[in-house]
Amino acid sequence: DGFIDYLFQKPCRGSKSYGKRASEVPTLSSGTVKKCYNILTLGFETAKRWNYISEIPNTKGPSEHYKKRKAWSSEHISKILDQIQDDPILHLSVHLAFNCSLRAGEIVAIDINSINLNEGSMWISQILERVSDESLKTLSKEKIAKVFPKQFSNAKSRLVLKTPKTEGSLRKQYLTRPLVQEIKERIAEINKTKELLGPEYQDNGILICQSEGRPVDQNKLCKSFKE
């Protein structure tokens, strides 16, 4: 029971902690703690048989609690989009999020080649996350599509383009006509910048990127939206 309590108080690592004060980092969710508990219980019988423990702990697994998210009305979404018209990248990101129910890590990883403008659809096939140097060593190479260079040499993490955590996250999304038009304008802007910068442009094939082609950190995108 003490170990379960410890897990509930343990701060998250990875993309949920980067760029945040210690007080802002969330603790492990009930779902994550439940998974840890299930893994531990699988080994109790073997541990007893090998005399690592004298008896199997009689503990009750933690309950999972789900937070209900309040859905925004179409009127509220339209109002928000109107307020951020002067920021094309943020506007397109928010438009994509609401139209396709995308997470931030999926938005900043959209592959231009996965978009079918004639059909009005796109495939969600990868995510972009900030990964610590230590965690990168243990990450399966099969899941990694691309590791981006560090912007600062003394940084202890870097952005990584990788496959989704589950097969269910790989999916096809359909786009509304206004969103298709906005994506067309974005791609035209990217092509224009490519011509202007030439070899200095970092072409990563990503729809939501910085002016010179570098990827956008999802934490910065979320921060821009909150502001």
Predicted regions and their residues:
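Hydrophobic (often cysteine-bearing) scaffold residues that line and stabilize catalytic clefts
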Residues: T32, C36-I39, S73, I89-L90, ...
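N-terminal DNA-binding recognition helix of tyrosine site-specific recombinases/integrases
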Residues: Q9-T59, R103
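Conserved tyrosine-mediated DNA breakage-rejoining catalytic core shared by Y-recombinases
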Residues: H76, I110-K192, Q202
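Flexible interdomain linker/hinge and immediately adjacent N-terminus
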Residues: R49-L81, C209-E212
